[in-house]
Design a protein with these regions (language model features):
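An N-terminally biased module of ancient metal coordination in phosphate/nucleic-acid-related enzymes
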Residues: 1-100, 104, 174-188, 209, ...
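Structural preference for beta-strand elements that scaffold enzyme active sites
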Residues: 2-6, 35-37, 79-83, 108-111, ...
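Short acidic/histidine-rich active-site segments
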Residues: 168, 236-252, 272-275
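Conserved, mostly hydrophobic/aromatic
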Residues: 8, 28, 110, 167, ...
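Extended hydrophobic/aromatic segments used for targeting, binding, or gating
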Residues: 207, 214-241, 256
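C-terminal functional module detector
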Residues: 153, 159-162, 179-182, 189, ...
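Extended substrate/RNA-proximal surfaces in nucleic-acid metabolism proteins
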Residues: 50, 57-200
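Active-site acidic/histidine proton-transfer and metal-coordination neighborhood
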Residues: 188-204, 211, 215-220
Length: 283
């Protein structure tokens, strides 16, 4: 029987979840998860150039203290990985804070993600717009999406450690366009640059199944499988599965279907990062 992994989940330590970490862990265990990765949001990408700690949403000391104790409680029963999701920004103050978090708390793994442009999350819509003669107008889709892909590529050169490259295609979730898709063929050059860098840097491409069965987003997975197929064709083999769960019912959502698709492409294992080691788990 294959071991079940879910690497990159959240709890109430993140600003967008209301579920206690203990409940998330209990639910994961009940669902048979063997490797469960907690990656709470460290949203230093919304600093707007400031350094005041009160702007940082997460209570990092409380999080790591609590999670490490729970990790000990589950030892021998479920492998709990205590990680962090670092929202990339070009803000050097944020880079310094991420480095300090790594040095002080040594997360088991780090997820590298793009949620924002100029400190504003795509969720709020602003990165899709510009101002012309004082009037707010939508950017052309290609311009907005290429800007997003450029940010991902820059994030791969982040001056702090990370293991997983998360949910490529996040920009499509909240886009105002009639056709929100970001097909590989239309952005091949920039996507190939990203995928090749992931391979060359020996990082892990995340297959994110958040809301897989809900039909809420244009893509059932991030990235779309055309990009995953291209990653495999380029030689990429390090992949991880993430439900990106923020509530118990979302844990391992879509995993069975995603595994079937990955096997059809030719993948044979997931890669689970833990303290610098890559653990290979058969699909």
């Amino acid at each position: 029987m294959a071991l079940i992994t879910d690497i990159h989940t959240h709890s109430a330590f993140s600003h967008d979840s209301e579920t206690d970490l203990k409940i998330m862990l209990s639910s994961a265990l009940n669902k048979g998860v063997c490797f469960y990765g907690v990656a709470e949001h460290f949203d230093y990408d919304v600093l707007y150039g400031k350094t005041e700690r009160e702007l940082c949403i997460i209570d990092e000391e409380n999080y790591f203290h609590t999670a490490r104790h729970l990790q000990e409680d589950y030892a021998g029963v479920m492998n709990v990985l205590v990680g962090a999701e670092f929202g990339y920004t070009e803000n050097e103050n944020a880079h310094t804070m991420y480095k300090a978090t790594v040095e002080k708390y040594a997360p088991d793994f780090i997820v590298n993600s793009i949620h924002t442009d100029n400190g504003i999350d795509y969720f709020f819509g602003e990165p899709y717009y510009t101002y012309v003669n004082g009037e707010r107008v939508a950017r052309p889709k290609k311009q907005a999406y290429e800007r997003y892909l450029e940010l991902i590529r820059r994030s791969l050169d982040a001056p702090y450690p990370y293991d997983i490259v998360a949910h490529i295609g996040y920009v499509t979730r909240y886009a105002p366009y009639a056709d929100k898709r970001m097909p590989y063929g239309e952005y091949a050059e920039k996507i190939d640059e990203i995928l090749l860098a992931i391979i060359q840097k020996n990082k892990i491409l995340e297959i994110n199944g958040k809301n897989f069965n809900s039909g809420k987003y244009v893509s059932a997975t991030l990235p779309d499988f055309d990009m995953v197929e291209r990653y495999f064709a380029l030689g990429g083999r390090n992949i991880s599965y993430a439900s990106d769960a923020h509530a118990p019912n979302q844990i391992i959502e879509g995993r069975k279907e995603i595994v079937a698709r990955l096997k059809a492409i030719g993948f044979t294992h997931f890669t689970v990062p833990c303290r610098g080691e890559y653990i290979k788990i058969p699909l």
